Regions:
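GHKL (Bergerat-fold) ATPase N-terminal catalytic module, capturing the glycine-rich phosphate-binding loop
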Residues: 1-194, 617, 621
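GHKL/Bergerat-fold ATPase module in large chromosome/replication-associated machines
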Residues: 126-129, 147-166, 186-190, 195-623
Length: 623
């Protein structure tokens, strides 16, 4: 029977159902990644209680104690802060998602405004927010006991909870204001009641900068540092560098002090690590504290992507931690912090280039390829490097400005380009090309990393509005033979000589050169690469899918060949060319050609090596 569209659907409302015991289990075991997290959460609660009491009593300072009891298998956190009333304990301690600190912050402002002073926006110096920190203790404990007396209150309260759903409230014998939280540890976490070094490590990891002394097992010495040099109103640079080295266990190449008040507050220091990053995918990791409580020592995305070599520690009071307090929320405040940090880094490095050039060059040299590779995608970084980054050239290390100044085109042979910049991307030809360019006023830039070629082109395009032609240092490039090699007209060798040199698979030319070299050889990098792939294919070491991609690439853009120039000004070459390929001098010439190719870094085929042996025998017979 068809349904009548006019028939009303039956509906009913049902409430969400929550398995409280299950939620507590999740809160205690799955929300946090490390078992020492409860140390952070309970120290945070103690800190907030003390800060709230300080707001009411200007003569009060406050103290946190952490006590271990191996016999009772307990770990206790004690503060002399504002404490809890019986009603507050009942309303807040056992309610997930509602915390006193969070409510105070919410009352401070319900409207986000990045320009609002932090004390108004977030409840001042309070850290807590989510009302879930106490439940992290179930990660270590199967029972929690809280005893508290409200500041200026009359009756202390005792709050006890296990892993189930029931909470027991009663009166307590506590006589002084403050709170104690005792964890009755699970057997597999008994080490937290016995190992003082383990607990102190957790205190230092999370609470080293809290402005409240924390004492372990009633020790007279506090466990936390409290005030680091980089948090001082006027930091001492030497002290900052010394403490950075101690905190991170490595000596900084340079320290970047950060002190920003608006639009967001940032305080701390970054430093240039001596550790070279292996690639460009590595991210800088920064230790971050929020209102002095360390969130993590591995916060990513705070510094520009081009600076993976930066490390440091920053106090970011305006940022919001994630619910597990192990990272920062990526929001408008976070973006504003990143922009401010980026501006500070650029400004610091720019100041170094002008006032401490030797220090800047040391940093630039140490992280050379990271700077060069990242500058391709960052215009501000390219501007920073344009007057300081030194390319390796045939005339020594030169900046892009110096390269351009030496590369003015010869108007007699160049009708369109105002500048001609020569470059070489093959390390094997570096010394060989340096010989040719030693007599030229123009340098050859050795872009031995692929990104350096792109960086060179980008910088040249931004440096001048005049026409700049970037050319490979190769005989196939316009005017290379005439301008650099000093060759007269270059002609193709005859078919007879091409056949004679066929095993070398090279283009053979004849020209008159002032060079004393009988043979000039130039390696085509793409040709050499194609032959490497051919060898892999023949040995069955190239996956078929990859092979198809390679074939398609070289079909679209043929590899070309290596190039040989026979110097007709050289007496031996001239006589060999006159006598022809049947004369023993042809064998001598082929040996010279193979030697020139080898010097330039070319791969010599096995058949050519066999012919070389035959040539030696032919020469011996002729003698």
């Amino acid at each position: 029977m068809p349904l009548d569209s006019a028939t009303p659907h039956k509906a009913k409302r049902i409430p969400f159902k929550v398995d409280i015991a299950g939620v507590i289990e999740i809160m205690g075991t799955s929300l946090y990644s490390h078992p020492n997290t409860p140390i952070r959460e309970l120290l945070q609660n103690a800190h907030d209680a003390i800060m709230r009491r300080r707001a009411r009593d200007l003569t009060y300072h406050g103290r946190i104690d952490v006590l271990q009891n191996a016999d009772a298998r307990t770990l206790t956190f004690i503060d002399d802060g504002i404490g809890l009333s019986s009603k507050e304990a009942e309303d807040y301690l056992g309610t997930l998602g509602i915390g006193i600190t969070g409510l105070i912050k919410k009352e401070a402002t319900d409207v986000f405004d990045i320009s609002m002073h932090s004390n108004k926006r977030d409840g001042g110096n309070l850290i807590g927010q989510f009302g879930i920190g106490l439940f992290s203790a179930f990660m270590l404990a199967d029972k929690i006991v809280v005893e508290s007396l409200r500041f200026e209150g009359e009756e202390a309260v005792r709050w006890e909870a296990g892993a189930g759903t029931d909470i027991e409230l009663s009166t307590s014998d506590r006589t002084s204001a403050g709170t104690s939280v005792t964890l009755y540890l699970k057997p597999n976490y008994a080490i937290f009641a016995d190992d003082a070094e383990l607990v102190e490590s957790g205190i230092k990891q999370y609470a080293d900068f809290l402005p409240i002394p924390i004492h372990l097992n009633q020790s007279n010495a506090r466990s936390n540092l409290i005030q680091a040099a980089w948090l001082e109103p006027t930091p001492d640079n030497d002290a900052v560098e010394e403490q950075i080295a101690s905190y991170f266990g490595e000596t900084p190449l340079d320290v970047i002090p950060i002190a920003v008040e608006a639009p967001v507050a940032i305080k701390g220091a970054l430093y240039v690590s001596p550790q070279r990053t292996p690639g460009f995918a590595d991210d800088a990791t920064i230790a971050v504290s929020v209102r002095r409580m360390v969130i993590s020592r591995h916060i990513r995305e705070l510094v520009p992507i081009w600076a993976p070599f930066l490390r440091g520690v920053l106090e970011l009071p305006n940022c919001s931690p994630t619910s597990n307090r192990e990272d920062l929320v990526r929001d408008a405040v976070f973006d504003s912090v990143c922009d401010s940090i980026s501006d500070e880094i650029y400004a610091h490095f720019d100041e170094l280039t002008r006032n401490q050039p030797h220090r800047w060059q040391s940093i630039l040299h140490w992280h050379r390829y990271t700077f060069a590779g990242m500058a391709i995608h960052d215009e501000k970084l390219r501007v920073l490097l344009s007057s300081t980054y030194k390319f390796i050239t045939s005339h020594g290390e030169l900046t892009i400005e110096q390269i351009l100044a030496r590369s003015r085109a010869d108007a007699l042979v160049e009708s369109e380009a105002d500048f001609v910049v020569w470059y070489n991307a093959d390390r094997r030809q570096e010394s060989w090309l340096n010989e040719f360019f030693s007599n030229s006023s123009s340098p050859c830039v050795h872009t031995l990393r692929s990104f350096e070629e792109t960086l060179l082109a980008s910088m040249l395009g931004e440096l001048t509005d005049e026409q700049v032609d970037l050319r490979p240092a190769s005989p196939s490039s316009s005017n290379f033979c005439e301008s650099i090699l000093g060759l007269d007209e270059r002609i193709d060798a005859s078919d007879e000589w091409h056949t004679f040199f066929d095993s070398l698979d090279s283009n053979i030319f004849i020209a008159s050169s002032p060079s004393k070299q009988p043979v000039l050889a130039f390696v085509n990098e793409r040709y050499e690469l194609s032959k490497t792939f051919d060898d892999l294919r023949e040995n069955g070491e190239l996956p078929k899918g990859f092979q198809r991609l390679i074939d398609q690439h070289f079909q679209r853009s043929p590899a070309g060949k290596n190039e040989i120039i026979l110097n007709s000004e050289h007496r031996l070459v001239r006589r060999a060319l006159e006598q022809g390929t049947a004369h023993p001098l042809a064998s001598v010439l082929r040996i010279l050609v193979i030697a020139a190719l080898s010097k330039a870094g070319a791969r010599i085929k096995s058949i050519a090596q066999e012919l070389q042996s035959e040539d030696l025998e032919s020469i011996a017979d002729a003698l």
